[in-house]
Structure formats: structure tokens, C-alpha cells
């Protein structure tokens, strides 16, 4: 198990964009999921700080000793039902997995969604990200038969929803 004695969770800064884009793309490549219709090819992956200036959105970065370990956020994706946001761009470096950091980031995102007045959190994911699926299920996310909203991530074949 890896140990990071002083992990900080903070909001995204402009200088985080390159590191976070690399973490997202490397993770998808690692799991064989660097496919069209995923965030791998989404241009916003290179401009997360700018994306998360949208009202009622938030992105949290996990950092230890000046090194970005990953992050995750919420976003009011177009076309989602009223009162619903999306859990987005939740990715961690390999050495930052299995230490509870993903759980901490999800908790922070869900808390922020509640504070922003959302009643539901939606997410899209892939079969290949099987470790994440287990965590989402533990948080009470339930599978949906079809996607919600207009994410344009046609490569994501699993959709989940959690009521807050």
C-alpha cells in the first residue's frame, strides 16, 4: 500500500490542467478504455479549470507534497433532469488507489452537490473501470437502462444514478 502522509483536497487551479489531463488519459489507456466517445478524446479534458468555472460545478484535486494524485468533480450537464448533476472526471494515479482517496473525493463531490441544491447525481462509466464500479455501488449509485443528458460520451456504456 502506498502512503501519502499529507494529502490535501483543494479546488482546481489553472496550472492543474496538464497534470489532470495526463492522469485521465493514462488511466483510460491503462484499463484499455482510450476509445472514441470517452473523455480521452473530449477537448474539455485539456481545460478542466475553465470547464469548472460553470455555475454549480466544482472540481477537487488531491495533492500530496506538491504532486497531483488525481481528482473528481460535479457538473450540471446539459439535458439532465431538473435537480441532477453529473459526477465527472474521477481519476487517480495508480499509486493513489486503494487508500480511500477515491472515497474521499466522492464524499466531497456528493456533499458539494447537496450544498448546491442537487437532489440526484448521475454518472457515466465503462465496464473496464471495474474498480470504480464497486465504489459507486457502495455509495448507492444504481444502474440505469439508458443514458441521461447530453454528454456526447457515446463510448460510455454504463450509466448510474444516486438520489441524495
Could you tell me what each predicted segment is?
Residues 18, 99, 158:
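Glycine-centered loop/turn positions within well-structured domains
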